[in-house]
Amino acid sequence: MKMKRFTIVWDFDGTILPLEPCDSEQSLLMHVMHHAGKPFGRLKKAYTKAIIYADRHERLRRTFKASYIRLLKGTPSGVIDEVCRSLAEKISTADRRVYQQLKTDGYQMMVLSCGTADLSERVLKFAGLQNCFSLIEGNRFEFDHNRITGMQLRLPDPEDKLHMMRAFNLSPDRTMVIGDGYTDLPLLNWSAMPVLVDRSGKKKKTFSAHNFYFISSIPELTNIIKKALTSNVSREKVPKVI
């Protein structure tokens, strides 16, 4: 008997979008710092670089978000398009085929991110992948006259993604969660099919205490899904992929 397709919930930065080395928010900040209509002064540049460094090392998350919003105020929407068009090129052809095939195969997929949904949406649009996802959720810029004025914090904390899943009445046994780090832990620990993307090969040791399945590339996900469809979708029956 053919099994019902399960829901696949994706993180964005570091999962769909390879970091190499900056995520989408950091990339936007870096671009604005170097190309702003009013150039950043020496102290402002030093501060921007410091908060980007802290965010890359998963520190001062709330401080980063507040500074991020303040530094981006007045940025035109067109600048976001420029950055996202460039970021979309990081998503490989092989990865794009996986998302498109999963969509064709009937999987409901959504993106939940503690980052900026405007960036996720536009990157996926420029990559030709936006229609693969039924929902793209995260924190959203507020605009006035096509310029950033603030941000609506819809998913500021990792636990907020889990609250949203529960509000959708999704079952952990029928939901695969794919992430790459600490902001994904509540969802990964909730799901019966947690997959951690480890492109560098360094995260397996960090998250060894968790019963996750590890993949080093998006195409490897295909094998996990095939096994899940022929098992009872339990962590014991779907072997970890190294």
What is each residue range found by the language model?
Residues 4-22, 188:
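Asp-based phosphoryl-transfer active-site loop
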Residues 211-221:
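Short acidic-hydrophobic, aromatic-tinged amphipathic segments that line or gate anion-handling sites
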Residues 137-143, 199-203, 218-220:
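Short, acidic/turn-prone active-site loops that include or flank metal/cofactor-
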Residues 153-170:
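Short loop-to-alpha-helix "cap/lid" segments that border enzyme active sites
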Residues 19, 113-114, 172-213:
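Acidic, Mg2+-coordinating phosphoryl-transfer loop and its flanking beta/alpha structural elements
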Residues 98-127, 133-139:
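Substrate-recognition element of Asp-dependent hydrolases with the DxDx(T/V) motif
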Residues 129-155:
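Histidine/lysine/aspartate-rich catalytic loop segments that bind and position anionic ligands
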Residues 21-22, 28-108:
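A metal-dependent, Asp-based hydrolase signature
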